[in-house]
Amino acid sequence: LIVNVPSYSETMELMKELDYSPDYKHIPRVLVASHLPNNDREIPSFLSQKIGTFIMGLPSALETLERANAGQAKACVFTSAASDPALDDTNTLTAGLIEKNWPQVITVMTCSRSETLGNLSTFGIDGGISTTDLQMGLLVQELEDPGIYKVYSELSSNSGGNQIYISHSKVGSWGENTQSFSFGSLKIAATQLNLPVEILGIQKTTNEKPVLNPENKLLLGSADHIVYMARKRFDWLGNSSKILEKIKKLT
């Protein structure tokens, strides 16, 4: 479920990234918007080819969400517009409505105001990004190290190359009575096993900042997820036995 069409170019860019996503490229898409660019009454053909259904209606209305079969969706993506900051509030309320009625649906949204991010957890919203923070942060990094944007573009696109991932499985699910181990020993084990990953850090909870490049002596907790770079998603749970065995030999 995709909510809002801030512009056709942005929406098509989102469709392109979804086409590259192994998790979402084969899932039918429903587009919901209260209005279209240029006050169009119908979506153009180049966009209609990328979706299954388009529903014109107020996304924050429960009736509209039911027409869109929101309860059957795997996820809902909300897009925002810098020219309409109030859309952040509407998106937050709509995403909160989905979480209240269908908590199994993954909800993520872009925020034109950075302060909106702080409200997402209150409504049970699963994730969000601040377009303003990203833009300003990248601008200064590009100033300090020209070319950093190309690195970011490589990592943030689903079209190929390397991406940043967060492991689906928690460290504690890798095995019963697993002894605690350090971040450094995990990196050494991954290197010696020639795993196709570059371990960057850990993520404790969705609402916390990830711990990137921590000290090697940091002990991983059972609820921690691995933040890593790879060309495709790595099956940590499926490879956990040999990883733990290698770590055991190191200690």
Segments (PLM) and residue ranges:
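Cytosolic regulatory regions of ion transport systems
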Residues: 1-251
